[in-house]
Amino acid sequence: MFPSTNQEVLALLPEAYAPFDPIVDVLPIIPLLFLLLAFVWQASVKFR
């Protein structure tokens, strides 16, 4: 019925988002950075 099916649209998404691949690779690390930041902050206030 429609010329472009869902499969065709989904197949094009990785190509469209290819420039963002380096950013996506770094995203899972961000929460770990917040965890490390908490320790650095507590060390700076001497864990009071």
From Swiss-Prot:
It is found in: Plastid, Chloroplast thylakoid membrane. It comes from the Eukaryota. The keyword Membrane applies. Belongs to the PsbK family. HAMAP family: PSII_PsbK (MF_00441). The lineage of its organism: Eukaryota, Discoba, Euglenozoa, Euglenida, Spirocuta. Keywords: Chloroplast, Membrane, Photosynthesis, Photosystem II, Plastid, Reaction center, Thylakoid, Transmembrane, Transmembrane helix. It is a single-pass membrane protein. One of the components of the core complex of photosystem II (PSII). PSII is a light-driven water:plastoquinone oxidoreductase that uses light energy to abstract electrons from H(2)O, generating O(2) and a proton gradient subsequently used for ATP formation. It consists of a core antenna complex that captures photons, and an electron transfer chain that converts photonic excitation into a charge separation. InterPro entries: PSII_PsbK, PSII_PsbK_sf. PSII is composed of 1 copy each of membrane proteins PsbA, PsbB, PsbC, PsbD, PsbE, PsbF, PsbH, PsbI, PsbJ, PsbK, PsbL, PsbM, PsbT, PsbY, PsbZ, Psb30/Ycf12, at least 3 peripheral proteins of the oxygen-evolving complex and a large number of cofactors. It forms dimeric complexes. This is Photosystem II reaction center protein K. One of its GO terms (cellular component) is photosystem II reaction center. It comes from Euglena sanguinea.
